[in-house]
Amino acid sequence: MHCPFCSATDTKVIDSRLVADGHQVRRRRECTECHERFTTFEGAELVMPRVIKRDGTRQPFDEEKLRGGMLRAVEKRPVSIDEIEQALTKIKSTLRATGEREVNSEMIGNLMMEQLMSLDKVAYIRFASVYRAFEDVSQFGEAIAKLQK
């Protein structure tokens, strides 16, 4: 790996350890030329299935869109970034585990709601109200009743 400081081509690994529940390797490296140290993260690049939207169009899976939806749902709620990242990892793992090349956006929305339900009930209601396009108070009541079961 090239040194980000001096662009030398030779660096050595000082320390390696697993992070993100074993899904990534964190490596501390040192440049043999300028002796600067830096950190790299290594993870498997796995192909995500394409998403079939409600209108039938297909698009590549967009992790940032998923993260943005979750962040909006948990905004100003007591949910840590680590919990959000773990939930996103579970959703992506479930999607990969289907073995399908394409998945419906509805499946992704349902997986998101499952994760939000276990993280924070208010965030779940927020997301469900937009995702399910609630139009009146009775639909909120039904969603809340589902949580209380």
Swiss-Prot record:
GO terms for biological process: negative regulation of DNA-templated transcription. Binds 1 zinc ion. Residues 49-139 form the ATP-cone domain. One of its GO terms (molecular function) is DNA binding. A zinc finger (unnamed) spans 3-34. Keywords: ATP-binding, DNA-binding, Metal-binding, Nucleotide-binding, Repressor, Transcription, Transcription regulation, Zinc, Zinc-finger. Its cofactor is Zn(2+). Negatively regulates transcription of bacterial ribonucleotide reductase nrd genes and operons by binding to NrdR-boxes. Belongs to the NrdR family. NCBIfam families: transcriptional regulator NrdR (TIGR00244). This is Transcriptional repressor NrdR. It comes from Shewanella frigidimarina (strain NCIMB 400).
